[in-house]
Amino acid sequence: MSLLDHAVSSGVIDLDKHQPLLDDRVHLCERAGIDPDFMLLAMDESVPPEAVSYVQAYRKLGRNGINGCAITGSMKGLTPMFSRMIGSYMRNFVDANLCSLEVAISPGWRHRSVLMIPDFWLRAKSEHVQGQMLSLMMEREGKQTVVAVADIEACINNCGPVMRDLLECYMVVER
C-alpha cells in the first residue's frame, strides 16, 4: 500500500477536500520546509498530546491570548515532530513553515501564519541575536510561533525579562 493510499484509508487525507493540496504537494512542502511525505502523515506518538491539542486549537489560540508554543525538554527528533505538525497545518490550509532561527530572523519569513523554529534556543546567544529573537517574537504577536527551547529558565536568564513576558503568552509543552 502506498503512503497516499494509507493516508486516505486512515482518514488523514480526504481526497475531495485535499486534492488541490495533493496536486501541488511537492511545491507546497518545499515552501514549508518539509519533505512531501509529511503532508500524508498523521501526528503520532512523537508529538506530545499537548502539542497535538495546540495544533488542533489553532484557530482559537490568538483569541485566547496564546501566541505560540514552546517545546522544552529533549531536543532529539524535533525536526520530524515539527514536520508532522506542519503537515497537519497544511491539511487544514494554514500557511506554516519550518525554518532555522537564522532564517526566521531574516527578512521575509515573519508573515507566515505559523512559524516553527526547532533551534530557537539551544544555548546562549549573542546580544545581537537575542535582540533579533525578541523582535521576531514581538512582531509575531497574533500569529502562532512554535519554538524549541532546551531550557526556558536559561533562555530567560540569557535574554532577560522581556523574554519572560513574551513566553508567558506561550503554551509550554514538555517532551
Report the location of each language-model feature.
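Residue-level preference for the first positions of well-ordered beta-strands
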Residues: 66-70, 114, 145
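Glycine-rich P-loop/Walker A and Walker A-like loops and their local beta1-loop-alpha1 context
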Residues: 45-88
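Conserved P-loop NTPase "ATPase switch" module shared by AAA+ and STAND
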Residues: 95-129, 149-150
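Post-Walker A helix-loop "phosphate-sensing" segment adjacent to the P-loop in P-loop NTPases
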Residues: 85-99
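Short loop/turn elements that form and flank the Walker-type P-loop nucleotide-binding site
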Residues: 64-65, 109-111, 140-143
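A generic local structural motif
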Residues: 56, 102-104, 132-135
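A short, basic N-terminal segment
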Residues: 1-60
